């Protein structure tokens, strides 16, 4: 499990690996843009979630992944799960 917060840079890297994200989009371009507008459907988010789980060693449920509307929401949820896992 990671001992540092999950960041937008982490998410962008994983999106590129898992779903072929546009690497040229900057943080200001995507943080609060919906995944739908960024071109990601639920299957791409589930694949991204699997990569996050393997990389940082936490469990994410499918509903959380598909309910996150923006990268900011997903990052916040991942960091909440990380914090909870560190305490447990």
UniProtKB/Swiss-Prot annotation:
Pathway it works in: Antifungal biosynthesis; monensin biosynthesis
GO biological process: antibiotic biosynthetic process; secondary metabolite biosynthetic process
Protein modification: 4'-phosphopantetheine is transferred from CoA to a specific serine of the apo-ACP-like protein.
Gene Ontology molecular function: phosphopantetheine binding
Highest taxon of source: Bacteria
Modified residue annotations for O-(pantetheine 4'-phosphoryl)serine: 42
Domain Carrier: 5-82
Signal peptide boundaries: none
Keywords carried by this UniProt record: Antibiotic biosynthesis, Phosphopantetheine, Phosphoprotein
Protein name: Monensin polyketide synthase acyl carrier protein
Species of origin: Streptomyces virginiae (Streptomyces cinnamonensis)
